[in-house]
Amino acid sequence: SAIQKNKMQDMTNIVEKIPDNMKQGNGQQAEALSIDSHYLYGDADSTFFDKIFPILIGFFVFFFVFLVSGIALLRERTRGTLERVLATSVKRSEIVFGYLAGYGLFAILQTLIIVFYSIYLLKVEVVGSIWWVLLINILIALAALAIGLFVSTFANSEFQMVQFIPLVVIPQVFFSGLIPLDSIANWVSAIGYVFPLRYAGDALTNVMIKGQGFEFIWFDIVILLLFILIFTILNIIGLKRYRKV
């Protein structure tokens, strides 16, 4: 990166400024000093884009699943399909699990397409296990599905659903790791912990760039599962607006 190149240039300049008499040893010319670079993660050709691409994959998975699932359920509600289902003896929990199962299959398929396209066509390097990459992206997709279904209950039109994007999706761009937040206050950075994409971004970065395994990503996986569980419960409660039992 540009920062690494500047640091290397500064070190080279320091070596060149060493007085000649300090480079002498017992009257003989000392061997020329050399600087060897070793990269903990990545290599000399790695760029900032390589660093954020794992997070971008998670972001695209979240964004498309959130938008499609929210609008799909909204259409069923505005066209009366949901009301006809609620008129039956089916429980609210069964309705929610049915929607999650149906749209979940579509979300998983969409996630597989995004991940495999990124890895095999865009040639994104994966240092760790691809199975962890798939699992993390499937979890963020299911979290986006549950959040999208919940948010759609507050929208009365597709336009209103789109208006939720700045509230739900855009903040995650800032707090997921796509934009460095090292210089901001700690309390502002802490806001990012309420967004699922932050945990997905951390886990994907650990697997795809650092090659780490379960012992480094288990906490992020647990948090993503909690997001899915919490918003599934909120969806069941949210259907009380349309039916009390």
Placement of each model-derived feature along the sequence:
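Transport-system extracytoplasmic interface segments
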Residues: 1-56, 60, 64
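Short, solvent-exposed coil/turn segments
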Residues: 28-30, 66, 168, 216
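Residue-level signal for pocket-adjacent positions within structured domains
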Residues: 30, 35-36, 68, 121, ...
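Juxtamembrane loop-helix boundary motifs flanking transmembrane segments in multi-pass membrane proteins
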Residues: 37, 41, 45, 73, ...
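Membrane-spanning alpha-helical segments of multipass transporters and channels
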Residues: 105, 109, 115-119, 125-245
